[in-house]
Amino acid sequence: MLTMDNVTVTFQDGQERLTALDNISFSATPGHLTFIVGESGSGKSTLLSAAAGLLTPDSGTVLIDDTPVDTRVRLEKIGMIFQQANLIGALNVRDQLLVTDHIRGVKPRKERADELLATVGLEGLGDRKMQQLSGGQRQRVGIARALMGEPSLILADEPTAALDSERSHEIVALLRNLVQERNIACGFVTHDTELISSSDEVVRVADGQVT
């Protein structure tokens, strides 16, 4: 579970101190997609960076399963999904997932990688190169990679922004099922409110505040 309590983040801009997040509090519940929506510049990306421990708030707390976020917690408990998937062109599909094991200092788990690829609809494609995959397939690789470390939280930064409507809904449906089945919390930044279902949670960000 992700809990952000009274989090404030500011940045220096010349002579001014700008407030990106203004004393925000919210939680992302396991088993649900929590959509984080708002206009450009509203603070969505800053919120996601704070949740991932990629920046330190000026004040407030960020907890994953009641533990303050630091580098160890980020490696052990958080899976990230990006807008462009951030895959390594020289590696095949399976090795994209195994990179996370190397980063975490554990023995590469090829069987787990293949199981996760099957789970996201890419069974038998472990030896394919990135250039042989469609945009939707690449995002499925990104989802499988995010699950390699058995996270309790997934943070997704506009993962459907480069996809058409049909592929976008497929990716969201896949994520929705995965977080329900595995009881994972998921913060999902998007500008596309048509992706949201009645079963999802919604956090609206405007001017650095949430509603």
Provide a role label for each language-model segment.
Residues 12-14, 98-111, 119:
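ABC-type ATPase nucleotide-binding domains, specifically the catalytic core motifs of the NBD
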